[in-house]
From Swiss-Prot:
InterPro entries per UniProt: PLipase_A2 (IPR001211), PLipase_A2_Asp_AS (IPR033112), PLipase_A2_dom (IPR016090), PLipase_A2_dom_sf (IPR036444), PLipase_A2_His_AS (IPR033113)
Cofactor(s) of this protein: Ca(2+)
Keywords associated with the record: Calcium, Disulfide bond, Hydrolase, Lipid degradation, Lipid metabolism, Metal-binding, Neurotoxin, Presynaptic neurotoxin, Secreted, Signal, Toxin
Binding sites annotated in the UniProt record for Ca(2+): 45, 47, 49, 66
The protein's name: Acidic phospholipase A2 beta-bungarotoxin A3 chain
Phylogenetic lineage: Eukaryota, Metazoa, Chordata, Craniata, Vertebrata
Organism for this UniProt entry: Bungarus candidus (Malayan krait)
Cleaved propeptide residues: 10-17
GO biological process, one term: arachidonate secretion
Listed PANTHER family: PHOSPHOLIPASE A2, PHOSPHOLIPASE A2 FAMILY MEMBER
Job of this protein: Beta bungarotoxin is a presynaptic neurotoxin. The A chain has phospholipase activity. PLA2 catalyzes the calcium-dependent hydrolysis of the 2-acyl groups in 3-sn-phosphoglycerides.
Enzyme class: hydrolase
Tissue-level expression: Expressed by the venom gland.
Similarity annotation: Belongs to the phospholipase A2 family. Group I subfamily. D49 sub-subfamily.
Amino acid sequence: AVCVSLLGAANIPPHPLNLINFMEMIRYTIPCEKTWGEYTNYGCYCGAGGSGRPIDALDRCCYVHDNCYGDAANIRDCNPKTQSYSYKLTKRTIICYGAAGTCARVVCDCDRTAALCFGDSEYIEGHKNIDTARFCQ
């Protein structure tokens, strides 16, 4: 039975490593009663895509993160969504490693800044799963 379970798990596509890193950073900075998944499909920018003006401070964190990834994508051979990087969670902060200006460091700094911003911003339940066609134009 263990083999069957492992074989079944092998068919689940893995998340890109940096997404796992970003999720870990978010979990480290947000209130205990929240999960990182509650930050997807929040406002106009948290989750895939984005348009219009951010609706609050938390949504602005995602807007800034999207733009940061856009800037990182201009670095030669840099794909922010799949770039792995090294970091450390310590004493309520996040430390990114690597040479300044490299793809890995820039992407880590994007994720670090967003995660810390999430931790500092109010989560408004009514801004989860909003009608983006209506509120994000």
